[in-house]
Amino acid sequence: MAISKEDILNAISEMTVMEIVDLISAMEEKFGVTAAVAAAPVAADAAPAAEEKTEFDVILTEAGANKVAVIKVVRAVTGLGLKEAKAAVDEAPSTIKEAASKEEAEKIKKDLEEAGAKAELK
């Protein structure tokens, strides 16, 4: 009469932890195997995908030759007065807009560059 899987599981469930460890060692020896945990398969894209930024700061890095046009763009974007906008342009590099959406930041950068300034997104 053969012993069923059910009988083996019942016998193991009644064992102490130390008895189970001894059983595992005996099985490893008898069958020439190890009871090591198999490593999880590695996905093809092992590098974690960087989350896309949703908020950008628009930095005016250089005012360029046409400061008047740049000041007009800065005023339109920020709502600053003439004096404050001129100061922001004169003190380049300066942050023109913080936490802007990607679309808004790209539009501001484009407008600044069309006015002759150099800008970057961070």
From Swiss-Prot:
It comes from the Bacteria. GO terms for cellular component: cytosolic large ribosomal subunit. This is Large ribosomal subunit protein bL12. The keyword DNA-binding does not apply. Homodimer. Part of the ribosomal stalk of the 50S ribosomal subunit. Forms a multimeric L10(L12)X complex, where L10 forms an elongated spine to which 2 to 4 L12 dimers bind in a sequential fashion. Binds GTP-bound translation factors. Pfam families: Ribosomal_L12, Ribosomal_L12_N. GO terms for biological process: translation. InterPro entries: Ribosomal_bL12, Ribosomal_bL12_C, Ribosomal_bL12_C/ClpS-like, Ribosomal_bL12_oligo, Ribosomal_bL12_oligo_N_sf. Belongs to the bacterial ribosomal protein bL12 family. SUPFAM superfamilies: ClpS-like (SSF54736), Ribosomal protein L7/12, oligomerisation (N-terminal) domain (SSF48300). CDD domains: Ribosomal_L7_L12 (cd00387). The keyword Nucleotide-binding does not apply. One of its GO terms (molecular function) is mRNA binding. Keywords: Ribonucleoprotein, Ribosomal protein. The lineage of its organism: Bacteria, Pseudomonadati, Pseudomonadota, Gammaproteobacteria, Cardiobacteriales. NCBIfam families: L12. Forms part of the ribosomal stalk which helps the ribosome interact with GTP-bound translation factors. Is thus essential for accurate translation.
